[in-house]
Amino acid sequence: MATTYSNFSENSPDIVLNVGNTFGIDADFEVPAFAEPNEYVPEIDSTYCFDKNTTLAILAGFSDNRRVMVQGLHGSGKSTHIEQVAARLNWPCVRINLDSHISRLDLLGKDAITLEKDKQVTKFQEGILPWAIQNPTALVFDEYDAGRPLSLIHI
Protein backbone atom coordinates (compact mmCIF):
# COMPACT_ATOMS: atom_id res chain seq x y z
CA MET A 1 0.00 0.00 0.00
CA ALA A 2 1.32 3.45 -0.86
CA THR A 3 2.18 5.95 1.82
CA THR A 4 1.04 9.53 1.43
CA TYR A 5 3.16 12.20 3.07
CA SER A 6 1.65 15.54 3.96
CA ASN A 7 3.44 18.69 2.85
CA PHE A 8 4.54 21.29 5.32
CA SER A 9 6.97 23.18 3.08
CA GLU A 10 5.67 26.52 4.29
CA ASN A 11 7.43 25.68 7.53
CA SER A 12 11.06 26.38 8.07
CA PRO A 13 13.06 26.64 11.27
CA ASP A 14 11.73 29.64 13.17
CA ILE A 15 13.82 29.71 16.36
CA VAL A 16 17.40 29.05 17.42
CA LEU A 17 18.44 26.97 20.42
CA ASN A 18 21.66 27.00 22.42
CA VAL A 19 23.41 23.67 21.88
CA GLY A 20 24.90 23.48 25.37
CA ASN A 21 21.56 24.08 27.09
CA THR A 22 19.56 21.85 24.75
CA PHE A 23 21.86 18.81 24.64
CA GLY A 24 23.82 19.09 27.88
CA ILE A 25 27.19 19.11 26.12
CA ASP A 26 30.06 21.58 26.32
CA ALA A 27 29.34 23.71 23.24
CA ASP A 28 28.45 27.37 22.96
CA PHE A 29 26.68 28.01 19.67
CA GLU A 30 23.13 28.06 18.37
CA VAL A 31 21.31 25.79 15.96
CA PRO A 32 18.07 26.39 14.00
CA ALA A 33 14.95 24.66 15.30
CA PHE A 34 11.18 24.68 15.08
CA ALA A 35 9.03 26.24 17.79
CA GLU A 36 6.35 23.57 17.42
CA PRO A 37 6.57 19.86 16.54
CA ASN A 38 4.60 18.23 13.74
CA GLU A 39 3.56 14.64 13.08
CA TYR A 40 7.05 13.64 11.89
CA VAL A 41 8.98 14.81 14.98
CA PRO A 42 10.15 11.88 17.15
CA GLU A 43 9.22 11.70 20.82
CA ILE A 44 11.81 12.95 23.30
CA ASP A 45 13.47 10.36 25.52
CA SER A 46 14.33 12.45 28.57
CA THR A 47 16.85 9.83 29.77
CA TYR A 48 18.91 9.90 26.56
CA CYS A 49 22.61 10.80 27.01
CA PHE A 50 24.26 12.53 24.06
CA ASP A 51 27.77 11.75 22.81
CA LYS A 52 29.38 15.14 22.17
CA ASN A 53 31.24 14.40 18.92
CA THR A 54 28.36 12.53 17.32
CA THR A 55 25.89 15.21 18.38
CA LEU A 56 28.05 17.98 16.93
CA ALA A 57 28.34 16.12 13.61
CA ILE A 58 24.57 15.62 13.44
CA LEU A 59 23.97 19.27 14.34
CA ALA A 60 26.25 20.34 11.47
CA GLY A 61 23.83 18.54 9.17
CA PHE A 62 20.82 20.32 10.63
CA SER A 63 22.36 23.78 10.75
CA ASP A 64 24.22 23.75 7.42
CA ASN A 65 22.02 21.42 5.32
CA ARG A 66 24.80 18.84 5.15
CA ARG A 67 24.63 15.09 4.72
CA VAL A 68 25.98 13.28 7.76
CA MET A 69 26.94 9.62 7.97
CA VAL A 70 26.96 8.06 11.42
CA GLN A 71 28.61 4.65 11.54
CA GLY A 72 28.89 2.03 14.24
CA LEU A 73 28.05 -1.50 15.20
CA HIS A 74 24.57 -2.92 14.76
CA GLY A 75 22.35 -1.81 17.63
CA SER A 76 24.75 0.85 18.93
CA GLY A 77 22.15 3.64 18.76
CA LYS A 78 23.07 5.51 15.58
CA SER A 79 19.50 6.05 14.40
CA THR A 80 18.25 6.77 17.91
CA HIS A 81 20.94 9.45 18.31
CA ILE A 82 19.76 11.22 15.17
CA GLU A 83 16.12 10.92 16.24
CA GLN A 84 16.83 12.35 19.69
CA VAL A 85 18.68 15.33 18.21
CA ALA A 86 15.74 15.89 15.85
CA ALA A 87 13.25 15.54 18.71
CA ARG A 88 14.88 18.31 20.73
CA LEU A 89 14.92 20.60 17.70
CA ASN A 90 11.30 19.74 16.82
CA TRP A 91 12.78 18.77 13.46
CA PRO A 92 10.85 16.29 11.31
CA CYS A 93 12.64 12.96 10.98
CA VAL A 94 11.74 9.92 8.87
CA ARG A 95 13.51 6.58 9.20
CA ILE A 96 13.82 4.42 6.07
CA ASN A 97 14.80 0.81 6.69
CA LEU A 98 16.84 -0.28 3.68
CA ASP A 99 17.01 -3.96 4.66
CA SER A 100 13.33 -4.29 3.83
CA HIS A 101 11.89 -4.50 0.34
CA ILE A 102 12.06 -0.79 -0.44
CA SER A 103 12.12 -0.13 -4.15
CA ARG A 104 13.05 2.63 -6.54
CA LEU A 105 9.34 3.42 -6.85
CA ASP A 106 9.03 3.85 -3.08
CA LEU A 107 11.96 6.25 -3.10
CA LEU A 108 11.16 8.28 -6.23
CA GLY A 109 7.43 7.87 -6.79
CA LYS A 110 4.99 6.08 -9.05
CA ASP A 111 1.71 6.37 -10.88
CA ALA A 112 -1.20 5.35 -8.68
CA ILE A 113 -4.83 4.75 -9.57
CA THR A 114 -7.25 6.74 -7.42
CA LEU A 115 -10.95 7.44 -7.47
CA GLU A 116 -12.15 10.96 -8.21
CA LYS A 117 -15.84 11.63 -8.72
CA ASP A 118 -16.47 7.88 -9.04
CA LYS A 119 -13.92 7.55 -11.86
CA GLN A 120 -10.52 5.94 -11.86
CA VAL A 121 -7.76 8.46 -12.41
CA THR A 122 -4.03 7.87 -12.69
CA LYS A 123 -1.95 10.34 -10.69
CA PHE A 124 1.73 10.51 -9.87
CA GLN A 125 2.38 9.88 -6.20
CA GLU A 126 5.71 11.24 -4.96
CA GLY A 127 8.09 8.96 -3.16
CA ILE A 128 9.93 9.81 0.02
CA LEU A 129 12.97 11.42 -1.68
CA PRO A 130 11.17 14.16 -3.68
CA TRP A 131 8.95 14.80 -0.66
CA ALA A 132 11.96 15.18 1.64
CA ILE A 133 13.68 17.58 -0.77
CA GLN A 134 10.64 19.86 -0.61
CA ASN A 135 10.27 19.71 3.18
CA PRO A 136 12.78 20.29 5.98
CA THR A 137 13.28 16.66 6.99
CA ALA A 138 16.02 14.50 8.43
CA LEU A 139 16.06 11.22 6.51
CA VAL A 140 17.65 8.33 8.38
CA PHE A 141 18.70 5.51 6.07
CA ASP A 142 18.81 2.54 8.41
CA GLU A 143 20.74 -0.65 7.58
CA TYR A 144 22.37 1.03 4.58
CA ASP A 145 24.74 -1.90 4.09
CA ALA A 146 21.77 -4.21 3.48
CA GLY A 147 20.18 -1.99 0.83
CA ARG A 148 19.64 -3.32 -2.66
CA PRO A 149 21.94 -1.71 -5.26
CA LEU A 150 19.01 -0.85 -7.55
CA SER A 151 17.51 1.20 -4.72
CA LEU A 152 20.74 2.69 -3.36
CA ILE A 153 21.72 4.19 -6.72
CA HIS A 154 18.88 6.71 -6.33
CA ILE A 155 20.01 7.91 -2.93
PLM feature segments, named:
Residues 2-153:
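AAA+ P-loop NTPase catalytic core and its hallmark functional loops
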